[in-house]
Structure formats: C-alpha cells, structure tokens
Amino acid sequence: MRWCASRRYSPAFNPDRFAAHESFFVEDVRRWVRSRFGVTPTADRTAVCGVSASAEFALAMGLRHPDLYGAVFAASPGAGYQPPGMLPSPLPRTYLVAGTQEPFFLQNATRWADALRDAGANVVLTQRVGNHGDPFWAAEFPLMVAWAFGR
C-alpha cells in the first residue's frame, strides 16, 4: 500500500495518531502561545489552517473544537476525512480553496462546502486557476486571513 500524508493527520485512518496530533495542538501549542506571548487566544480571533492532508486535520479540529477555533482555513483538502453524516453544532466559519488544475482536491473542497452550508455554517469556497502546491496556497492565505479577521 502506498503511504500518504493523510495517514498522519486524518481521524479516518489512525485515531490514535490523530489524537496525538489533536492533543499537541489543543494543549501544547496553546500553552506555548500563552507562555511565549502572554495571550490566551479566543475562538473569534483564532483559526486552524491546513493544506492538502493537513487541511483534513484542520477541518477535523474545527469540527471538534469550535470553542477554540472560530475559523477553519482548508486549502486543497484530501479525501481521507469526509464530512460526517451529522455535523456538530456550532460550526466554525470555514474558508475552502482548491485549484482548477487539481480536480480531485476541488471535488473534496466542494463536498465539504456543500455539507457545511447544508448544516448552516458560514462557508466560502473559492476555486482559482492553480495546482497542488505552495505558491497557490501562499497566494490564498492573505485572503483567508482578511475574510476571517478583517485585516
């Protein structure tokens, strides 16, 4: 079987490994931010972001912790973690993007956007000419931040 990055982050593949990543973000990273910067991030000013396989992780974190992450930025999400049949409430605001030159990932982003919208979430789905890579995602990141935080 071919290894893929989704196996590191997706609750669909390895719940124990996902739980370790989840604990790191929810506990360790938040503790570090408090100690390093002297702030306690609030959900309305905090987003969780990922690209490709880590976009699946960002979506899972947003669904599981809307009290911590008020926004999700998911660029070119993979298909290992798909929208559950019943989405929790409340849902974080979600910005999804995928390139027209990566149809597999565009389909996954659209699947998530549709499911989240149907559940009443505030969702942006953007498709742009582009492919699966850092320059495409880096160009979109400032737009995500401006949408979520008005900057």
Regions found by a protein language model. Name each.
Residues M1-R151:
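Non-catalytic cap/lid and distal C-terminal segments of serine-dependent acyl enzymes
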